[in-house]
């Protein structure tokens, strides 16, 4: 949690993909609240750091948060720091500085897994998108992502407040009925169903062990993100807690935070 909060309070622009696996309805809204709080803190920190020392900030960088799942129903996350081409290289790149091409940024992408042992056998997002082996080898060979340690006092206060917010949300998650944790790994019991569909085929993941996963034929990440949709059902939250909405349907979006 401290690693995620330090990334969210970093001074770089952040791209958040609204996808969260194996979560209950109340923790889904908690993550929305956390992203709203972290967006304001990241905007303030980026403006203050650029005014003080602009050479320490990587130009036109972003972090792409993608959530996937493993065969043992334990979610792990992919953190991909993406970097646009330098605007001072050519005049044509200055015109295209507002557009973030994911396929052209794969040379600067890094991969960080919370369960690295399950990477070869798990259906990761790279395997689902049918990326070539050269790009997969490039992502696996890149070094781990390092967070900038030079932060001002306002950045440290924002990161500490985010850590307190995470602890408070975890405390509420334990107290509110409907969520259960295992004593060994502190993993929340899956209580929602995630459905993601593309133009050619669909990807499904639920709490049952017999869930089947089919890989889409599209190899473009932008086309897949633009066509995703999710459905969260609150029927398995418990008898003592009833949600006024039976299901929530929406579309995935990509939002750039910061300058």
Swiss-Prot record:
It is a multi-pass membrane protein. Keywords: Membrane, Transmembrane, Transmembrane helix. It is found in: Membrane. Its main location: membrane. It comes from the Eukaryota. Almost completely overlaps SPT6. This is Putative uncharacterized protein YGR115C.
